[in-house]
Amino acid sequence: MKNLFLFCRAGFEKECAAEIQQRAGELNVGGFVKANNNDAYVVYQCFEDDAADTLVKQLPLDSLIFARQMFAASDLLVDLPENDRISPIVAALSDVSKAGEVRVETPDTNEAKELSAFCRKFTVPLRQHLKKSGSLLAQENPKRPIIHVCFIGPGRAYVGYSYSNNSSPHFMGIPRLKMAADAPSRSSLKLDEAFGQFVPKEEQEERIRSGMNSVDLGACPGGWTYQLVRRGMFVSAVDNGPMDEKLMETGQVKHYREDGFRFEPQRKNIYWLVCDMVEKPARVAELIEAWAINGWFKEAIFNLKLPMKSRYKEVTAILETMQTILKENGVTDFKVQCKHLYHDRDEVTVHLWLRPNTAWN
């Protein structure tokens, strides 16, 4: 297969396209992008047959900022007959053998999601035929490739596969999170999703645990503080504005009515630093850099608000500058990840982990 299909948020196709063009070039996989505004997906068409397999194997999905999910794809199947959509799809997947799962999906747009009910019904007979053809195992296997069938419109679909070790575990790359009734704001879901995105399940018990000390800069009214409290942490909530009363009643939160940019923690045994302030992204990055250079935290999650134009260029420039400044100031052992999360809008979420191979005392 020569195409790479990437899911993204509607309105961010240009950013996703610019990113995959650059990242594919770094792997010497030549090609060109096909993208339309508000389609919520991008297709990177490789010049060489089967080159998409190189990308789904060697380009880590977690290293892409704007792609939620990706899979190697056939050319677009069009005019699928209403009386037999299955046969052309099974034929297009003839080179896929013993996959462990099939997902029938759509892009994340209102128009495409009108096909959701059809996709659910269609999955059952398609699964049966794929098992008969040998493309799909009789029993689901989380270690085998995943077959993707993405309907972009009635009778029009991209089909292909991803590898389970380089793929989102979520349908369409979207985690299904529920808004807690007592959460102070919807922004709470951003940190909830970020923990799942940046901290593997098998490490969460060690890295996100009860009793840890944390700081929330720009905390009001407490959406992100809520997620820290829910996980049993003690929180220094820094904001001139008021905090949610129920959060304060937990006894786990100390409210500092201060400017987050001027706050200096009294305790230096802070594990988590979180920050979701409506500020220029470069200024927020400088703040996190200062905390990192001072060694005031172990892991940080923070949001960078995006400009209206050149969003991919701006984000990558800020992240590159951050890494340079940290290294120039003696902070050389760290890991940075960045993702445009489902619950993000005009922003991206960054994870900075200091000394990832050194245990926290």
Swiss-Prot record:
Keyword annotations from UniProtKB, A to Z: Cytoplasm, Methyltransferase, rRNA processing, S-adenosyl-L-methionine, Transferase
Active-site residues (renumbered): K305 (proton acceptor)
Protein EC: 2.1.1.186
EC top class named in words: transferase
Binding, S-adenosyl-L-methionine: S187, C220, P221, G222, G223, D239, D259, D276
Example of a GO MF term: S-adenosylmethionine-dependent methyltransferase activity
Subcellular location: Cytoplasm
Record-level GO cellular component terms: cytoplasm
Keyword S-adenosyl-L-methionine in annotation: yes
Subcellular location, principal: cytoplasm
NCBIfam families: PRK11760.1
Subunit structure as annotated in this protein's UniProt entry: Monomer.
Family: Belongs to the class I-like SAM-binding methyltransferase superfamily. RNA methyltransferase RlmE family. RlmM subfamily.
Protein name in the entry: Ribosomal RNA large subunit methyltransferase M
Gene for this chain: rlmM
